[in-house]
Amino acid sequence: MRTIIYTSNTGSTAEYAQLLGKELNLPVHSLQQAKNKVPAGSEIIYLGWIMAGGIKGYKEAAKLYKVRAVCGVGMGQTGTQLKEVRDKNAIPQRIPLFTLQGNFDVKKLHGVYRFMMNVMVKTAGKGLANKTDRTLEEDDMLDMIINGGKRVSLQNLKAVTEWYKSIN
């Protein structure tokens, strides 16, 4: 059974999982739901949200299932931070890794995550705002920090869908 399994915090990862499931015609379950519906050892594509470089739920999913690809959803632009995310999560080189830019709304975060992001918004936002030679990626990050932003799109999944279609 091939399935998309995800862990989401504010909804971006769930939104990507649903878009990908529709595009690839695969069932989609949260990691919690999957424990009761998807047999251990099944082949999956795992999507998780990124916090400080860590993909939430990946280690648990990797213990339960045969992870065939990983998508990390965070604030960075799609396709960036691949080495850092792979290293931090100990994702084997044989497993394709994709990073996807999600939405950002600090009000949707809860508890310690909200506190941490409020601190990050103040410190990183101030640092980026004062920087005179920002890159396009830094301009985009600053815009998200200041104004929030919706970045989930089917276009961001293009590399994932191309990979999947190339192996099937």
Question: What annotation goes with each model-predicted range?
Answer:
Residues 102-128:
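Short, solvent-exposed beta-strand-terminating loops
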Residues 11-14, 79, 106, 154:
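Loop/helix-junction capping segments adjacent to catalytic residues or to phosphate/diphosphate-binding pockets
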Residues 32-112:
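Helix-loop-strand module that forms the ligand-binding subsite of alpha/beta enzymes
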